[in-house]
Each structure stands twice: as structure tokens, then as C-alpha cells.
């Protein structure tokens, strides 16, 4: 993927050949500036895929159309075989944003980047963790660092083998939810590095070694945690097995 005139020069000096070219239509990350499209170095490239990337495709803003028009301008100015502008959210903007190739990313993993795609995509990541220990709290007992949760009455809880080292961040403290056969198991107190405490009231038969599921439907989990759907996926640590 060529992103600059300098890279194009290096490519040609090394013998050239088929390549892809990224054009910056306004996101100001990678890509050749629009005003460099007419450079003779670009005219010498044998370009397969002419690409750009939308900055705000998950929102309904005028800048989407501005970028699409710049992409059309680039397509008209540069010889190429195929073109691509849209990722997952851009696909939902309509065929005018597609070109010959689209680049679904988040949606392949069950993410829903735009409301139009709700109900069309299925969750694919279902993290689970095991209960390491079951405890019986008494009224007045507190849980976890800084004692942010205190039991109001006797309560059965489970210590689960997942924490922020696995990507289950402290933002879930006191508001996250795990499940067993559809039954809610709220997070109690602070999420620790390697463990999280949950309320077992709804599933009193659970014991050490049993597995519970994280509430990880991406749109809902993003709304609850304040994290993006992308962060929720990429945070999942290497300690998870498939």
C-alpha cells in the first residue's frame, strides 16, 4: 500500500509492479494528499486498488458526502483497476460509497456500527470465565479493593477468573453483568487484575469450576461501559482460549 510520493518513488526505484494506493480524502491519517494526485510519479504506478477511508461513517454528517466526492475525483484522476471507500459503517451508507470492493471489519465480529445494521448481524464473541471460589457474605461484609460494595444481607457470591488483565476493565466495576443460562449475575465491587466478584443469587446451584458468560453483545456492552465496540473486541486478552 503506497501512501506518499516518497513511497511511490521507492516502489518504482525497486522495480515497480502492481500496487495499491491510499488517498487521503479528509481523515488525515495515511494516504496521498489530494493535491498530489496529478504528480507524474503517480501516473507511472500500476495501481490495482485505489483506496480511501471515511472519517465519520458511523454518523450522519455532511463530511461523508464531501469525502465521497473527493474519492470520485481521485477515481477520475488516477488510473486504477478497482476502488474502495467503505468499511463496515460505510457499507450502510449505500452503494454510492462502495466501489468494486468494500472492507467490512467490525461487522465481521458482530459489531453494529450503524442503526441500519441492527438485526442484520449476529454476536460472534462470547467470552466465558470460570468460578474460582464461592463465598458466603454476611450483612456488612464488603467486597474488593476500596470496599466499594457492602452486602446488606447474607449473600452468596462467586469469584470469577477474569479481570482487567484480560481486557475486562475497571469500568465494569459495580455495573457489569455476567450470566448463567440467561440468569443475571451482577458484578459486585471493583474489577481486579485477575478476578471479578459476582452475585450468585439468581443461580444458587453454581459452584467452583462452573463457567459463566460475560454480557458481551457489542452495542449494548458499549453503551453500558462507555467503551467503543472496537475497544471491547481488541481488549480481549491473550489468556482467552477458543
Q: Language-model features: where?
A:
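Active-site-proximal beta-alpha core segment in soluble small-molecule metabolic enzymes
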Residues: 1-84, 97-98
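Predominant activation on well-ordered alpha-helical scaffold segments within soluble catalytic domains
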Residues: 9-12, 72, 128-132, 230-233
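Solvent-exposed alpha-helices and their adjacent loops that cap or buttress functional pockets
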Residues: 14, 43-44, 77, 93-95, ...
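Conserved, mostly hydrophobic/aromatic
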Residues: 21, 50, 87, 105, ...
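Active-site metal-binding loops of divalent metal-dependent hydrolases
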Residues: 25, 54, 88, 106-107, ...
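Short, acidic Gly/Pro/Ser/Thr-rich loop/turn segments
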Residues: 28, 57, 109-111, 138-139, ...
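Anionic-ligand-binding alpha/beta catalytic cores of soluble enzymes and soluble regulatory domains
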Residues: 60-154
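C-terminal accessory subdomain/extension
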Residues: 136-242
Amino acid at each position: 500500500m503506497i501512501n506518499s510520493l516518497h513511497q511511490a518513488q521507492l516502489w518504482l526505484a525497486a522495480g515497480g509492479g502492481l500496487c495499491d494506493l491510499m488517498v487521503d480524502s479528509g481523515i488525515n491519517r495515511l494516504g496521498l494528499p489530494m493535491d498530489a494526485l496529478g504528480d507524474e510519479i503517480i501516473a507511472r504506478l500500476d495501481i490495482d486498488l485505489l483506496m480511501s477511508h471515511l472519517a465519520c461513517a458511523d454518523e450522519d454528517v455532511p463530511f461523508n458526502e464531501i469525502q465521497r466526492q473527493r474519492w470520485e475525483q481521485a477515481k477520475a484522476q488516477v488510473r486504477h483497476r478497482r476502488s474502495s471507500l467503505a468499511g463496515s459503517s460505510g457499507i450502510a451508507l449505500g452503494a454510492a460509497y462502495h466501489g468494486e470492493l468494500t472492507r467490512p471489519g467490525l461487522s465481521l465480529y458482530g459489531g453494529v456500527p450503524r442503526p441500519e445494521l441492527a438485526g442484520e448481524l449476529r454476536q460472534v464473541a462470547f467470552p466465558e470465565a470460570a468460578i474460582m471460589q464461592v463465598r458466603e457474605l454476611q450483612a456488612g461484609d464488603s467486597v474488593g479493593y476500596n470496599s466499594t460494595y457492602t452486602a446488606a444481607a447474607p449473600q452468596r457470591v462467586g469469584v470469577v477468573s477474569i479481570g482487567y488483565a484480560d481486557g475486562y476493565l475497571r469500568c465494569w466495576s459495580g455495573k457489569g453483568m455476567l450470566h448463567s443460562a440467561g440468569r443475571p449475575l451482577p458484578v459486585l465491587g471493583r474489577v481486579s487484575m485477575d478476578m471479578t466478584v459476582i452475585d450468585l443469587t439468581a443461580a444458587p446451584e453454581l459452584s467452583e469450576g462452573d463457567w459463566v458468560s460475560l454480557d458481551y453483545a457489542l452495542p449494548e456492552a458499549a453503551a453500558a461501559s462507555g467503551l467503543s465496540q472496537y475497544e471491547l473486541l481488541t481488549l480481549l486478552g491473550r489468556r482467552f482460549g477458543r
